[in-house]
Amino acid sequence: MGNRAGAHFCLASGLRLPSKGGVTIGVIYVISDSLGETAEYVARAAASQFDGGGLDIRRVPYVTDLDHLEEVVNEAAQEQGIIAFTLVLPDLKKKLLELAAARGLEAVDLLGPLMDAITRVTGGRPRLEPGLIRRTDEDYFRKMEAIDFAVKYDNGKDIRGLSHADLVLIGVSRTSKTPVCMYLAHKRLRAANLALVPEVPLPGELLNLPPEKIIGLTIDAGLLYQIRQERLKTLGLPGPAGYATRERIEEELAYARRVMDQLGCPVIDVTNKAVEETAGKILQIYYRRERNGK
């Protein structure tokens, strides 16, 4: 992935300017409800004007809930850092300003004032959707690479890809592994996936992965039964088939749970969740771990 270099990739990226006597005298937390690249560029530009002190820039992407927000602000308070943010969701922005004020922190809204000015001049209303900006340079090619990766290593086509993935999704058949991987690819994460089948031994490539690279997907047995029945109808196959019986589904789900427990990976229940919702939870897990250096 890009942006792996930096003084503090524990928060997705970092820039450290020369410091006096090797001591960092300032930390800027860049908080965003999307990737946060826009805010980071502005923070870098501002930091570059201060040659006399060390400024450590820590980007925290995909902050989309209040618990995550409070966690980051508390960390910033421990460092007495500056907060620069591009949050377009009003509730999150309001809460951030309240938390920062309560802790005596400087919090700078990099996007809001300009959006307010555009509204005053044009009379238009902002869409208030995170991540609308689209980049067509290096990020575009990284996205294309991630999409190619997801296609090449879909459903265990080539087990060698597991060790090169940013994330590996595991679960029984019809738990949305493939569409979630494609969604993650559009966020420039190289995601592979592997179906868990009781009769198929787990590959060594999976067993050798660190748990933080693996995400387990599970689903309600009743819903999975309906999905598989519909799948058989779509394919024009007669039922019932072993693949779609309740007994088989219960067996597969129990096996998958044992595997996930063995691997020690986080598990997400995809029951009645849209692909975007599942992917959003995965992104939160991924970037929190990056921020914590795990």
Curated annotation (Swiss-Prot):
Which InterPro entries does this entry report, sorted A to Z?
Kinase-pyrophosphorylase, PPDK_reg
Q: Which UniProt keywords apply?
A: Kinase, Nucleotide-binding, Serine/threonine-protein kinase, Transferase
Per the record, the domain of life is: Bacteria
Pfam families associated with the record: Kinase-PPPase
| Catalysed reactions, semicolon-separated | N(tele)-phospho-L-histidyl/L-threonyl-[pyruvate, phosphate dikinase] + ADP = N(tele)-phospho-L-histidyl/O-phospho-L-threonyl-[pyruvate, phosphate dikinase] + AMP + H(+); N(tele)-phospho-L-histidyl/O-phospho-L-threonyl-[pyruvate, phosphate dikinase] + phosphate + H(+) = N(tele)-phospho-L-histidyl/L-threonyl-[pyruvate, phosphate dikinase] + diphosphate
Q: Does the keyword Nucleotide-binding apply?
A: yes
What parts of the sequence cross the membrane? none
What's this chain's function? Bifunctional serine/threonine kinase and phosphorylase involved in the regulation of the pyruvate, phosphate dikinase (PPDK) by catalyzing its phosphorylation/dephosphorylation.
Which HAMAP family does this entry report, sorted A to Z? PDRP
Record's protein name: Putative pyruvate, phosphate dikinase regulatory protein
Question: To which species is this protein native?
Answer: Moorella thermoacetica (strain ATCC 39073 / JCM 9320)
